């Protein structure tokens, strides 16, 4: 593989100890990532996507690593979102909350507790699992069923697409921006409907 250490503004880890520690999640799978990235910004994430596209390498996101199905392991680039994307902003008297993918369910529920509220999804691993994984897997838990799962409780998302475009699905012009700047992604999403 080409030297990737100078290809982005973010230095990846390829240390053997890091590779081995990220080779496992809560599942029985063992996949050794080529590199581990811990971006701090959406722009750095876009750089990782660009490099992965250039090299034909897959990108896997990891936060809590609590899935029993192996979604948090990869033999490509592994992006750790737990270290730098932990933001929680409670608004509207706890009716809405804006959360970054690395925040744990427990941290979010602790922030909402003063309003006597909590998230809909209630996975058993709430102390370690993160919002990124909960949303990606549409996690629910024992109590929320299908009425309060992730998909039913999300108002909007801010996404960094593989082509580097950052899109806020809550913006009134999100559909037009996506159609204009990423027509193939837009067409693919329309085809899924």
Protein language model regions, located:
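N-terminal flexible segment immediately upstream of the FAD-binding catalytic core
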Residues: 1-54, 64-95, 124, 147
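FAD-binding subdomain of flavoenzyme oxidoreductases
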Residues: 88-91, 100-101, 105-193
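Residue-level detector of anion-binding/catalytic polar loops
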Residues: 57-58, 118
């Amino acid at each position: 593989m080409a030297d990737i250490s100078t290809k982005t503004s973010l230095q990846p880890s390829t240390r053997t100890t890091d590779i081995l520690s990220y080779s496992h999640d809560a599942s029985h799978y063992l996949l050794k990532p080529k590199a581990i990235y811990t971006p701090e910004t959406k722009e750095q994430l876009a750089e990782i996507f660009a490099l992965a596209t250039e090299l034909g390498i897959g990108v896997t996101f990891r936060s809590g690593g609590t899935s029993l199905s192996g979604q948090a392991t990869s033999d490509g680039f592994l992006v750790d979102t737990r270290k730098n994307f932990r933001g929680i902003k409670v608004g509207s008297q706890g009716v809405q909350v804006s959360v970054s993918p690395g925040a744990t369910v427990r941290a979010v529920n602790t922030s909402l507790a003063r309003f006597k509220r909590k998230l809909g999804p209630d996975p058993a691993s709430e102390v370690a699992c993160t919002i990124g994984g909960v949303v990606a897997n549409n996690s629910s838990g024992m109590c929320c069923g299908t009425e309060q799962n992730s998909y039913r409780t999300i108002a909007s998302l801010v996404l960094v697409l593989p082509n580097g475009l950052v899109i806020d699905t809550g913006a009134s012009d999100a559909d037009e921006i996506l159609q204009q700047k990423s027509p193939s992604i837009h067409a693919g999403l329309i085809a899924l409907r």
